[in-house]
Amino acid sequence: MKNYIDGGEAILEAFRQLDIDYVIASPGSEWGSVWEAFARQEREKTEGPKYLNCAHETLAVDLAIGYSVMTGRMQAVMLHTGVGLLQGSIGIDTAYRQSVPMVVVSGESLSYSEHDGFDPGPQWHGVLSVVGGPTVLASGITKWSQSVSSQHTLYEQLIRAGEMAQRSPAGPVYMSVPIETMLHDWTPPQAPRAVPPAPKPVPPAKDIEAVADMLLNAKNPAIVAESIGRDPAGYSATVELSEMLAIPVSECRWLDFTNFPKEHPMYQGMGEPDYLKDCDVVLTLRARAPWTPPSAKPANAKIVNIDETPFRPHMVHQSLQADIFLEGDAIATLQSLNSIIRDRIVDAEVSQRWEKWSKVHNDMVARNKAIEADGLSKETITPIGLCATLSALLPDEAVFVDETITHRPIIIRHLDYRGPRSFYTAATGGLGQGLGLALGTKLARPDCFVVSVIGDGSFMYNPVVQSLTLSKHEELPIFVVIFNNMGYSAMRKEHHSYYPNGLAANNSTSVGHTITDMDYAELARAFGFYGRKVDRLIELENAIKEGQRAVCSGQTAILNVVLDEGDTSI
C-alpha cells in the first residue's frame, strides 16, 4: 500500500492551515487526489476539516454560506469543473453580494488524454473543457479567480486565496486545479506558517471624533441599519450607541440580518420612516441601499456612512448620498465611536428624545398587535396570522432563515425573533437557496431550533430532494414553514402594476403567476419526516406543535400553510 503525498495532500494541508472546518463538496471525477488525502487523514488521525458530501452544487455553496454566517468562520467548497461551477453559481453570487468569505475549487484537465501513460477520461476533451478555462465562469461573481500554476505553487496559491477571501471586502474566491497538478508529488513545507487572521483597519481617529461631535450636537439623529447585525458585536455596538444618545433605529428594506432588538424602545421598524425627513444627522450602518430611489436621501440631514466597502462593486447603480464616509471595519469603527461618546457629557435633550421615540415605538407595537389580532380572528390563515401564531409557539431562541419575497415585510414586522443572528435572509434576488442556508445554519448551531420560512415559489426553485436527503443523512432537522399563496404573487403584482388597466388585471389572470398545485408536505413523508398541510386557523396551532415535536425528536418537518388569497396586505 503506497502512501501518496501529492497535490491532494497540498490542498488538504492548505485547508488545515486556513482553519477550515468543512470541505463541502458536490464533486466530480477529478478529486481522487483529495479523497486519498482525506483517507490518509482518517488513518493517521490527523486533525483537519471534515468532508461533507452533497448531491447538488447550490446546496453545497449555501451550506457553506449558512455555516459561515452563523460562526464567522470561512469554509471551502469543492465542485466539478466548469459545469459544477455553473450549477453552484447562484450561491457563489450570494456569497459575493453578502461579503461571505469562501474558497471554491473545481478541477480541470490540461492533457486531454494526450499524455502517454495518463488518461483522465474522454469526457475532458469531449464535453467538459471550457474555452479560457473555468476561471472565466467565476470572474464576475468572485473577488478573484485563478488557475493553479503548477504543483510547486499549489499550496501557497490556495493559502493566498483563503487570505484574500477574508480581506475586506470579504467574499468568495475561486481556484481551478488541474488533475495533472494534483497527481504530482508534493513536498510539504518544513515549518508551515500559521495563517494570521485578516486585519481590521479603521478610519483615522480624527474622523471618528468628528462624527462623535456631530452626533453629540445633533438635535434629531437617526440610525439606518442593513447588515451590521451579522456579527453579534455589531448588534451590541448599535444598541449601545442608540441607548447612549436615544437615537431611533430603523432597518433597510433589503436587510440581510436582524440588526437591533425589535422589542427595544428605540426600534422603529423596517423601511423608510417619515421621520427621516426631519433628521439632522443620519448614520447608515453597512447599508448598500438605505433608501429608494437611491437619490432620495433625507433632505435636511448630514449622512454618515460606516462600512467596510461603501461602494459595492457588484451593484450597477448605487447612490449613497453620504457626506462623510468612515470606511474601514464597521464594527471596530462603531466601537471606537462608542468609546468616544461614552466619555463625553451627554446633553439633557437625550432623555427627552428617549421619551419621544419610546412613545413612537409603543404606538407602532400597538398598531402591529391590532393587525395581528385581526389576522387571528379569521377562519382562514393570513400571512400575519401565521406569523403571530409562530411567534406565540416557537422558542425564543429560534433562528429564522427567510426565503420569501412578497411576505418578507410582513415577516419582519410580525414575526418575533430575538437577539443577534436570529433572522437571516438571502436578499440577493436569486431564489432556490433557503433550504441550504437553513441546513448550513443547523450545521453551525446543532442545538438551535432552525426555521426555514419560505414561499411556495421559492421552495420550487430549491434542490428539495437533495436538501431533505442531506437533512436525513447528516441528522440536521429543521422546521420548514411554507407560506403558500398558490402562485408567484410578486410576478402578478408587478405585471398588474405595469398594466393596471390591462387584460390580465381586468380578468384576474396572469400567465406568469401560476404554480402547479401540489401538497409539499407529501415530500416530507418520503423521507420519514413530518409533513402536514393546513388551511384553517383552528388547525394551525396543533400543526405547529406537532412539527416542533418532530424537529425536537430529530425529524425535519414541512408545514404547508395555505394562505388566504383575500389578504390584501401582501
Model-derived features: positions:
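N-terminal alpha/beta PP-like core and its mobile active-site loop of ThDP/TPP-dependent enzymes
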Residues: 1-345, 393-396, 449, 468, ...
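Conserved short loop/turn motifs at secondary-structure junctions
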Residues: 226-231, 375, 455-457
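Phosphate/pyrophosphate-binding active-site segments
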Residues: 1-2, 149-152, 300-404, 508, ...
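Short, well-ordered beta-to-alpha junction loops that form the rim of enzyme active sites
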Residues: 176-180, 226-227, 403-407, 561-564
